[in-house]
Amino acid sequence: HEHRGFAGTLSLPPQLLLDLVLAVGTDLAAAGFQRLVLLNGHGGQIALLEVAARQLHAAQPALAVLPCFLWRGPEGISQRIPEPERQRGLHAGLAETSLMLHLAENLVGPGRQADGPDQEPPEGWSLEGQAPCAWLTRELSSSGVIGDPAGASAELGQALFEALVEGWRRRFQSLLNSDWPPGSRRC
């Protein structure tokens, strides 16, 4: 719900997502699936999908449930994004805008101004990461942009895209080559 109040935003109650993951996962387990990867690209759903994964696995112990966040995982992604954008660029900032310039440039508007406050969370805290603060988009931005998209480019977007695809491909291949979850028997 952190983006509520901005045009085009649809927000679903958190319980609905939990119930949906549990229902779909239960049916997949009944159909014989042994693994379910929840690949998420929205930072506001990281913790919720981790809870959903744990609940689903508790209800269906034979189903390995792996909640993944697009930007966490592939090595080298964060190094391609300069500071302070690495910490601040959470929504329509440099990285996301660059990706969109690479994938669908016609959907990116010409004016890319950052309008969020310069104030940082207290020392030791962050907007996301190891010690996240709860926040709402309207507290950080009047436009919905959190970060600075001004330096975005299709070239950076292509580099990020290729690194994300290759990084996740390697990670999924590793999963396929494994016997995960522990104690499972595979044919």
What would you call each of these model-derived segments?
Residues H1-V37, G43-C187:
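Extended, histidine- and acidic-residue-enriched regions that form the cofactor-binding/catalytic faces
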